[in-house]
């Protein structure tokens, strides 16, 4: 049914690049269902802005990783949230959509919901993995949760939270069969011979902590597999500058540093060494063997370990419910360990075939036309609140 003809104003907040990707996919679906006069505004990144989103604050202001690191930015982040809350309470939007960034968004959604503004949250925080107490915040803050993983809906509904499983937009975006040859041609990589994609993260703190270890691991892999080539995406000019000292210090490496497009770099690869995060799901959807790693400051790591419920951190392992790819974390992430594990993933053809089967099944489960499903859920919430004509 059509919505009432009065103008719609949808406030949205995405706090990091993965949220920018998710929100941009939702904007596509909303644009097909809502009037052209609908306004989309709040906090967003370049993908959202490219679709006409009005960003009142820079998304990068919220993109801080780790407990200790975040403390330095708390005053600025709280200031942004308070100002946005003031604006939204003064001129209430038709609905508020928080995209990931739960620590920021739940604190905003709660007072908005109390004021009668419908609140929708896109991406359930991983309460099934760690910090399960956040379910209490969800109950208070969120009218409707949009879940990207299938098992989350039942978990939320047990606590009285209305939820819809919408699938993951990456599963819609990525083809079921990756075009490795086409990606190599596009990136100027040789048609044959082993290629390893290396993704050490996108934040300054991540590059500082794990970048040198990844580069040392690449040196060891080159010694043991002389014909190997490496490809590393630099998502932004700022990231390229962060990587430049490491690239210069390892000038002997046969490394192709690309401008952005991590997905294309991973498509071209035979195996991947990757920092944990959403990018590991992309690697799985591309059907690539991988090694997952991370290093965070000691105190942050201790807090994460104490609040965790699952024995794994990588999304491919979480979705499979078991270890299907290796995870080498914290002080275990030595150059030797990373090189050994990555070369094993590169060379083990039987394991490659098994992973292809596992990841293909995973792809089918997550491929749900997310933009359409998410947009339909949002429109449903707005219609229910405003009343159907």
From Swiss-Prot:
Gene Ontology BP term (one): lipid A biosynthetic process
Disulfide bonds: none
SUPFAM superfamilies: UDP-Glycosyltransferase/glycogen phosphorylase
Function: Condensation of UDP-2,3-diacylglucosamine and 2,3-diacylglucosamine-1-phosphate to form lipid A disaccharide, a precursor of lipid A, a phosphorylated glycolipid that anchors the lipopolysaccharide to the outer membrane of the cell.
Classification via Pfam families: LpxB (PF02684)
Alphabetically ordered keywords of this record: Glycosyltransferase, Lipid A biosynthesis, Lipid biosynthesis, Lipid metabolism, Transferase
UniProt cross-references to InterPro entries, sorted A to Z: Glyco_trans_19
Record family assignment: Belongs to the LpxB family.
GO MF entry, a single one: phospholipid binding
Pathway note: Bacterial outer membrane biogenesis; LPS lipid A biosynthesis
Enzyme Commission number(s): 2.4.1.182
Keyword Glycosyltransferase: yes
UniProt organism field: Paraburkholderia phymatum (strain DSM 17167 / CIP 108236 / LMG 21445 / STM815)
EC supergroup of this enzyme: transferase
Catalytic reactions of this protein: a lipid X + a UDP-2-N,3-O-bis[(3R)-3-hydroxyacyl]-alpha-D-glucosamine = a lipid A disaccharide + UDP + H(+)
Cellular-component GO terms for this entry: membrane
UniProt entry tagged with the keyword Glycosyltransferase: yes
Protein name: Lipid-A-disaccharide synthase
């Amino acid at each position: 049914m059509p919505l009432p003809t009065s103008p719609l104003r949808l406030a949205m907040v995405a706090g990091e690049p993965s949220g920018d990707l998710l929100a941009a996919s939702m904007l596509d679906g909303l644009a097909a269902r809502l009037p052209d006069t609908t306004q989309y505004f709040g906090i967003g990144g370049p993908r959202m802005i490219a679709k006409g989103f009005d960003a009142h604050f820079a998304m990068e202001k919220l993109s801080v990783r780790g407990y200790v690191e975040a403390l330095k930015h708390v005053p600025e982040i709280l200031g942004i949230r308070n100002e946005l809350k003031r604006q939204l309470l003064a001129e209430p939007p038709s609905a508020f959509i928080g995209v990931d960034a739960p620590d920021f968004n739940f604190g905003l959604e709660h007072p908005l919901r109390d004021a009668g503004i419908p609140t929708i949250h896109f991406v359930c925080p991983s309460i099934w993995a760690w910090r399960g107490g956040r379910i209490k915040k969800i109950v208070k803050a969120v009218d409707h949760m949009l879940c990207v993983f299938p098992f989350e809906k039942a978990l939320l509904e047990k606590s009285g939270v209305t939820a819809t499983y919408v699938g993951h937009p990456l599963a819609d975006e990525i083809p079921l069969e990756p075009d490795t040859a086409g990606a190599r041609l596009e990136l100027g990589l040789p048609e044959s011979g082993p290629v390893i994609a290396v993704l050490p993260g996108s934040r300054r703190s991540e590059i500082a902590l794990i970048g040198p270890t990844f580069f040392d691991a690449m040196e060891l892999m080159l010694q043991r597999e002389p014909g190997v080539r490496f490809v590393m995406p630099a998502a932004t000019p700022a990231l390229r500058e962060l990587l430049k000292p490491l690239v210069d210090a390892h000038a002997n490496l046969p490394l192709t540093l690309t401008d952005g497009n991590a997905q294309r770099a991973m498509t071209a690869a035979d195996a991947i060494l990757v920092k944990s995060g959403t990018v590991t799901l992309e690697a799985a959807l591309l059907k690539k063997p991988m090694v997952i790693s991370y290093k965070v400051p000691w105190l942050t790591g201790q807090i994460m370990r104490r609040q965790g419920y699952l024995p794994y951190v990588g999304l491919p392992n979480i979705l499979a419910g078991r270890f299907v790819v290796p995870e080498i974390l914290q002080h275990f992430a030595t150059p030797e360990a990373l090189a050994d594990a990555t070369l094993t993933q590169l060379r083990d053809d039987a394991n490659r075939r098994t992973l292809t089967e596992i990841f293909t099944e995973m792809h089918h489960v997550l491929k749900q036309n997310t933009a359409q499903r998410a947009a339909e859920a949002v429109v449903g919430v707005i219609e229910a609140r405003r009343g159907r004509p």
